[in-house]
């Protein structure tokens, strides 16, 4: 297979677009939760339920994008170095995660999920389990994929360009994942272990299908790219049908609306997320084919800071919400409040991600120059 059909693909890839779309969409979710919990009318709750399901693709898209880009860059380099992989992601992912988790636990302790820490032991547990803030469960899950990257690299080496092996891997992955969803639905989602097994939602197996499919999408990019660009209309149909399906399921739980009843761990949401991923990928390929260089550069730039912006978004969300008295506005204009708070949060999150990265880069250079240590 050709490495690139278009030279413009070297500027930004499908993974970049998925990260930016996912990061942008996910920033709306905590804001919707806050506004929806303010005893809104049923009509408003219906609207928020539809919007929530619309953007409920973010974690799968991010995982797919991370695996796609990592396997792509390693494949083009001709090898995968686990040490260099961890070294790079220690600075890009682990360090920001540590700092932001500390900020949430110490600076905004009211954001903790489930239980609040009351000792050093419970502090450490909240630190690692993703309960320090509403969105940090994803960090706990995503970092598992970073650690397990050699496993997914081995899958890419196993299938290589063998379509039969790829098909077998895809089928086995789908069967295992659907079995996992059935298990989760029976035992955890409103099941007997809803309260004591809830952390299963952030174990890597709950999202591994998107990682495997991200690997296969790169390894068989000629087939994947041709399919999503040629049959984008069919993917749109699947997207609409799955979107209707997810909204129907959520409506069956009645009102007041609870976003807990719209989890990722359902067949409807799985196929919906895969459809959204394919549509975003098709959009990326369209811009690549049209050589829309400026757009590609913008997406690549934003993708670099997407994870850091994600970490910061709830922090800025809280400051915007409290500082601008958004609670008052949400009573009368819930949707305008959502979009206004969303926009401000997005701007502040990406701006702070960029500025903090620039500052941290300078600090590292100073430390390295004085101590000869790598951070």
Regions found by a protein language model. Give the residues of each.
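Membrane-interface helix-boundary motifs at transmembrane edges
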Residues: 8-12, 75-87, 154-166, 219-232, ...
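Functionally critical transmembrane alpha-helices in membrane proteins and complexes, commonly lining
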Residues: 13-73, 93-101
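Juxtamembrane "helix-exit" motif on the non-cytosolic side of transmembrane helices
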Residues: 34-40, 110, 114, 181-193, ...
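Interfacial loop-to-helix transition and helix-capping segments at the boundaries
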Residues: 49-59, 127-141, 185-210, 247-278
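Transmembrane alpha-helical segments and their boundary/interface "anchor" motifs
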Residues: 52-60, 73-107, 117-134, 234-238, ...
């Amino acid at each position: 297979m050709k490495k690139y059909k278009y030279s413009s693909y070297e500027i930004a890839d499908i993974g970049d677009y998925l990260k930016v779309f996912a990061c942008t969409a996910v920033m709306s979710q905590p804001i919707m939760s806050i506004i929806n919990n303010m005893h809104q009318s049923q009509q408003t709750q219906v609207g928020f339920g539809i919007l929530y399901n619309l953007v409920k693709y973010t974690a799968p898209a991010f995982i797919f994008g991370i695996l796609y880009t990592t396997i792509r860059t390693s494949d083009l380099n001709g090898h995968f170095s686990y040490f260099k992989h961890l070294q790079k992601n220690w600075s890009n992912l682990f360090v920001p995660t540590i700092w932001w988790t500390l900020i949430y636990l110490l600076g905004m302790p009211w954001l903790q999920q489930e239980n609040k820490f009351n000792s050093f032991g419970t502090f450490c547990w909240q630190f690692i389990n993703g309960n320090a803030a509403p969105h940090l469960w994803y960090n706990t899950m995503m970092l598992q994929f970073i650690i397990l990257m050699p496993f997914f690299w081995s899958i890419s080496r196993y299938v290589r360009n063998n379509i039969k092996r790829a098909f077998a891997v895809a089928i086995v992955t789908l069967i295992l994942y659907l079995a996992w969803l059935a298990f989760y639905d029976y035992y955890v989602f409103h099941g007997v272990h809803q309260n004591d097994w809830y952390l299963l939602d952030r174990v890597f197996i709950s999202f591994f299908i998107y990682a495997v499919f991200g690997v296969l999408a790169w390894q068989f990019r000629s087939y994947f790219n041709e399919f999503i660009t040629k049959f984008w209309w069919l993917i749109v149909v699947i997207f609409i049908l799955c979107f209707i399906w997810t909204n129907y399921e959520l409506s069956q739980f009645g009102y007041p609306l609870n976003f807990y009843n719209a989890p990722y761990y359902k067949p409807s949401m799985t196929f919906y997320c895969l459809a959204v991923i394919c549509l975003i990928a098709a959009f990326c390929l369209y811009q690549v084919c049209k050589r829309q260089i400026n757009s590609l550069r913008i997406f690549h730039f934003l993708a670099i800071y997407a994870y850091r912006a994600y970490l910061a978004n709830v922090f800025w969300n809280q400051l915007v919400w409290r500082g601008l008295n958004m609670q008052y506005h949400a009573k009368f204009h819930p949707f305008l409040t959502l979009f206004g708070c969303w926009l401000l949060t997005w701007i502040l999150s990406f701006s702070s991600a960029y500025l903090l990265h620039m500052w941290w880069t300078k600090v590292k250079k100073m430390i390295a120059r004085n101590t000869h240590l790598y951070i």
